Amino acid sequence: MNFAENSENFCDKAVFSPFPGGTREGKKFFSGAVCLFDSGVGGLSVLFKCREMLPSRKFIYYGDNVRAPYGNLPPEAICRYVSEAAEELAGYFPPALVLACNTAEACCGESLRKKYPFPVLGACPSVLAAGKNGGDGLVLVTRATYESRAFASLLRQAEMRFPAARFYPYPCDSLAGKIEDTLASAPDEFYTAELPTQKFSFVVLGCTHYAHVREAIARRYGCPVYDGAEGLARRLAVTLAAGKTEAGSRGSAEDFFPEENENGVDFSAGKGKEQNLRPCVTTSVPATQNSADFSAETISSDGKVLFLGSGREKNRTFYEHSFARNLS
């Protein structure tokens, strides 16, 4: 199908669709597209890496920006919101669903893998890639990720694999919200002022929002900074190439890169090492709204990405400005 030849009426209907779940045209054109979910703009860095590795694929990006960030919400609310989005995305019959949100993966990734007949892959802090050379590592995460069993188990496994590395998790209660509100356009100090002042050998970004201020964090600490976007995109590419579309596919990086795991491991109960660092100031929790009220569609200029959710227009604009031009 030539998108340019068929988009005149389609785009108009899609953008202004009043129907929850999108128009019939949208569902037909993007049926079988790879689906990504994030609470807001964070997962756009993952979308960009996926587009780089899979240029012929179509994608759907669902952003629940009106309730972002998720990191300060209770796990029950997070799982409810993610489940709402996943149910809508399942209607597009995706070959895979990517949770481009560390908080969503930590809180409900495993339950979604048990529910759906397609692979569900999730973003995890890249502690296994970062810990290979040892040293003291700062792991920046949201409050919900910090308190999850999944994250504790991940740290425990990383410490067992790399005993020369020490991981210090740090809950950033306001950083994702600052990035969401400013679209990473503020001076470095705005994002780094509340971070720990200690020196570290490496920093791991445990929230996809943080990737948008990666350079600011690198300048602050003067050490390598790791995020999981590329590793997650690689896992998706391998999953699709291998035809792993059966129910129960765990989406773990261990399945594909047992020696060079760049994006986390299977989760189970456990405990990670903690340091008594001062957390960022907690911000207020966004008011809840029905996601079905924000289901009209917006499509990227090249016709490859359908944006859904309350932040569809914001995410499309930020994606086009920050990433899409680099794909041409």
Where in the sequence are the language-model features?
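Non-catalytic structural scaffold of enzyme domains
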Residues: 1, 16, 26-328
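Extreme N-terminal basic, low-complexity initiation segments
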Residues: 5-10
